[in-house]
């Protein structure tokens, strides 16, 4: 029978996922209190950075935004991704991989599970469109993006490490 104990990398990933979810949800409660739920409400923050209320009903680039079943499809997909990543992290041996997985798990739970179940859409509010980045995003989105970048970096570093050991 397989062991149900959580590995060191698992603890790292779950702690980072929990922090990501908490920061994401606190920031969304704060922004909803500050701007209300009305889409388009905006407040300049610092230079080119604004806080702008956006209801994101779809996924990247607005995919599935007009679909009645898209919300539930995204919730189901997110559950599968979180389960898959939770299994993967227990096989992980490198902390960087665990950190990346934790950020992605936290982002998936914050955006596609909590927001879509509670609001029916994802609450986006970080607006840097004046810096030529047209998408409004949130902390969970940032967690997913940074997490994916860390997975790529970990993959590159582990391959480089394998190559250096082969040439010795």
UniProtKB/Swiss-Prot annotation:
GO terms for cellular component: plasma membrane. The keyword Protease applies. One of its GO terms (biological process) is proteolysis. It is an enzyme of class 3 (hydrolase). The keyword Transmembrane applies. Pathway: Protein modification; lipoprotein biosynthesis (signal peptide cleavage). It catalyses: Release of signal peptides from bacterial membrane prolipoproteins. Hydrolyzes -Xaa-Yaa-Zaa-|-(S,diacylglyceryl)Cys-, in which Xaa is hydrophobic (preferably Leu), and Yaa (Ala or Ser) and Zaa (Gly or Ala) have small, neutral side chains. Its EC number is 3.4.23.36. The chain crosses the membrane at residues 15-35, 69-89, 95-115, 133-153. GO terms for molecular function: aspartic-type endopeptidase activity. Keywords: Aspartyl protease, Cell inner membrane, Cell membrane, Hydrolase, Membrane, Protease, Transmembrane, Transmembrane helix. NCBIfam families: lspA. This is Lipoprotein signal peptidase. It comes from Caulobacter vibrioides (strain ATCC 19089 / CIP 103742 / CB 15).
């Amino acid at each position: 029978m397989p062991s149900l104990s959580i590995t060191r990398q698992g603890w790292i990933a779950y702690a980072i996922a929990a922090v990501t979810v908490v920061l994401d949800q606190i920031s969304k409660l704060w922004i909803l209190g500050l701007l209300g739920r009305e889409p388009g409400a905006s407040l300049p923050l610092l230079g080119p950075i604004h806080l702008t209320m956006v209801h994101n009903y779809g996924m990247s680039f607005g995919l599935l935004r007009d679909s009645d079943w898209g919300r539930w499809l995204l919730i189901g997909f997110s559950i599968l991704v979180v389960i898959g990543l939770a299994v993967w992290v227990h096989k992980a041996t490198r902390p960087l991989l665990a950190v990346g997985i934790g950020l992605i798990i936290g982002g998936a739970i914050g955006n596609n599970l909590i927001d879509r179940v509670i609001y029916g859409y994802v609450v986006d509010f970080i607006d840097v469109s004046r810096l030529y980045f047209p998408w409004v995003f949130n902390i969970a989105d940032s967690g997913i993006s940074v997490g994916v970048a860390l997975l790529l970096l970990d993959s590159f570093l582990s391959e480089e490490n394998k190559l250096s050991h082969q040439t010795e």
